[in-house]
Amino acid sequence: QWFDRDGDGYGDEPFGNEYDDCLDVFGTSIVDRLGCLDTDGDGRSDEGDALPNESSQWDDYDLDGFGDRIGGVMGDSCPTQYGNSTNGSLGCPDADGDGVYDVEDSWPNDIRIWSDGDGDGFADQSATNLSDDCPLVEGYSSIDRIGCLDSDSDGVSDEQDFYPNDAKRTEEQLIYQKT
């Protein structure tokens, strides 16, 4: 090479060694094209880099904006599926847009709720008709408090039930008997 008009160390002669693929741009790319702009310094030209501003990522097969290298910054947990999840597994399908991957979302079609840590079917998130009043305890009460321990399965939580082991007698029944 006898001439390098942009001064990046790659020559302008197309038939010479280490030909500059971007003749008029000072560039440092060395992987896919020589001498082209490489903003993030990962060795790949910006044109050949799906994420040109993140050096730990360069491929994005499904074009969702999350890099295919799971170990890199914002690594895609579902690299072959377009996805928008941002909470936990990144770049996976999230139908309701709450940020949680549908497979990990207890309610994949309700943006307000997504988890049930105690597995009782009531949501950990508050302010909905499915919100668990006792999110750390698996319970099935549904009358006075939602999702709390109900030993006799009468719908009244043990905490409010004068007879927590007798489904035929509850605090509510006692109140009605007194009136």
Predicted regions and their residues:
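Extracellular calcium-associated, cysteine-rich motifs in secreted modular proteins
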Residues: 1-179
